[in-house]
A protein has these predicted regions:
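Cytosolic regulatory regions built on CNB/CRP/Popeye-like sensor folds
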Residues: 1-132
Length: 132
């Protein structure tokens, strides 16, 4: 099932022009987003982590851990985003297993990507922990 099927209701869809900041690192995270149209770039500081394409999600981490945003999101192109607040997010996680699995998959993919980046960086080569 595609996320766009879960979010067929466009009442909470919001347009963003290319170059518009959707959220910034350090912001309080009270919503997550599903890309309906267009593309969104995710940055950690000045590092480009990924480009989220239609049917992709972002901003979910702050809904789970209640911490501030660790990344910034900027509209790469003109885009339309489905906004999901905390109440709706919790409902979907509980009532729609496909949605819950999709969120876990996105988080796992991002964790793997960051793990690979750390392993390839100087940090990954110089901080291996205690040596026997």
């Amino acid at each position: 099932m595609r996320l766009s099927n879960i979010f067929a209701d466009t009442s909470k869809a919001r347009p963003f022009a290319a170059g518009t900041s959707i959220f910034e690192k350090g912001d309080k995270g009270e919503e997550m987003y599903v890309v309906k149209e267009g593309e969104v770039d995710i940055f950690i500081n000045d590092f480009h982590l990924e480009t989220v394409i239609p049917d992709g999600i972002f901003g979910e981490l702050s809904l789970i851990d209640r911490e501030t945003r660790i990344a910034s999101a900027i509209a790469r192109t003109d885009c339309t985003l489905q906004v999901v607040d905390k109440r709706r997010f919790l409902f979907l996680i509980q009532e729609t297993p496909v949605f819950a699995i999709q969120v876990m998959k996105v988080m796992a993919d991002r964790l793997r990507r960051v793990d690979l980046l750390i392993a390839k960086s100087d940090f990954g080569r110089t901080n291996r922990g205690p040596q026997n």
